[in-house]
Amino acid sequence: MNSSCKTRVFNIISIIMVSMLILSLGAFANNNKAKADSHSKQLEINVKSDKVPQKVKDLAQQQFAGYAKALDKQSNAKTGKYELGEAFKIYKFNGEEDNSYYYPVIKDGKIVYTLTLSPKNKDDLNKSKEDMNYSVKISNFIAKDLDQIKDKNSNITVLTDEKGFYFEEDGKVRLVKATPLANNIKEKESAKTVSPQLKQELKTTVTPTKVEENEAIQEDQVQYENTLKNFKIREQQFDNSWCAGFSMAALLNATKNTDTYNAHDIMRTLYPEVSEQDLPNCATFPNQMIEYGKSQGRDIHYQEGVPSYNQVDQLTKDNVGIMILAQSVSQNPNDPHLGHALAVVANAKINDQEKLIYWNPWDTELSIQDADSSLLHLSFNRDYNWYGSMIGY
């Protein structure tokens, strides 16, 4: 090949290489622009401080994917790509914050669960954030509400009071989850405002927490899951005191494989003389729980404290239902939900750690938390101490 041909070939190759480089740089720039545009539209949640204890970060990263997979299995949902958003806090209108950290769990780009890290046992409530032991819990708590505005260029504060949970955005306060209290008005917009002190504290935070996917994904594994056969969520408690009625109905329907039981009918059986108007105010006492179970052919007995993981595992295998009895840590005598009852649905091992899966009658989904935690941080920002169990439904 003569020198002119060589030069021509070299020039052609050079032009091709330069063109490819320009195209690749353009693609890289467009990709970065797409990422920047995507992140610019991400929802941001205001926090007083973006500092999170290292043990909280580590626990969240280690546990979130396994928890999400286990909960998906309970609802027969397909698993997907799980990612963890950044931690956020929930505040009262006067600026007080609770002792928990919340993370959005994102599956295939959609917020599906909320991971909550809260004090593990009652003794931890008096410890500092750095010293306390944390329990990890997952549920669908406000996940759908966050997902609805995830891709908006929004900046919100998550607030709570006795009526429920709110999103504050541009000075407007909107109720997103109402508490199960009688005569609770489920107003879409509230006249409440954030206290000036909280506004000032939120302004001092350099970076609000972002609801966006993190790159690092842990390969959490669900080694074992044992579920009470035939358990289904058929109803939900709201403005009544029938938590034990709901729990007993759900457990008996599961262990008898029927749709016969419901909370209203159980409460009507326990209070035959009470009017329909007054029935929602009737609660259930331990002796009634035992007697009703016996009337349905079940040998019910009370057991103090939290049953061991192995006991739950065996009872669940034997198709025997367990009802959780819990008491509010606040001990407020005016609280209509001072005591609460829940149903144990399953147990699991996630990354070799023992977990319990339960149903809170206030919710339409299940929750998972550590099996050795006696403190239940429930969906309405209330801490309950699991003090005993009714076994045998």
Curated annotation (Swiss-Prot):
Keyword entries, A-Z: Hydrolase, Protease, Secreted, Signal, Thiol protease, Virulence, Zymogen
Signal peptide region: 1-36
One of the GO BP terms on file: proteolysis
Active site per database record: C243, H340, N360
InterPro entries, per database record: Cystatin_sf (IPR046350), Papain-like_cys_pep_sf (IPR038765), Peptidase_C47 (IPR008750), Staphopain_pro (IPR028076), Staphopain_pro_sf (IPR037155)
Transmembrane feature ranges: none
Site feature location: Cleavage: E219, D220
Compartments it resides in: Secreted
Entry PTM: Proteolytically cleaved by staphylococcal serine protease (SspA).
Major enzyme class: hydrolase
Record comment: activity regulation: Prematurely activated/folded staphopain B is inhibited by staphostatin B (SspC), which is probably required to protect staphylococcal cytoplasmic proteins from degradation by SspB.
EC number(s) recorded for this UniProt protein: 3.4.22.-
GO MF entry, a single one: cysteine-type peptidase activity
CC terms in the record's Gene Ontology section: extracellular region
Maturation-removed propeptide residues: 37-219
Role according to the record: Cysteine protease that plays an important role in the inhibition of host innate immune response. Degrades host elastin, fibrogen, fibronectin and kininogen. Blocks phagocytosis of opsonised S.aureus by neutrophils and monocytes by inducing their death in a proteolytic activity-dependent manner. Decreases surface expression of the 'don't eat me' signal CD31 on neutrophils. Cleaves host galectin-3/LGALS3, thereby inhibiting the neutrophil-activating ability of the lectin.
More info: The cascade of activation of extracellular proteases proceeds from the metalloprotease aureolysin (aur), through SspA to SspB.
Record-stated family: Belongs to the peptidase C47 family.
Subunit structure: In the cytoplasm, prematurely activated/folded SspB forms a stable non-covalent complex with SspC.
Name of the molecule in the record: Staphopain B
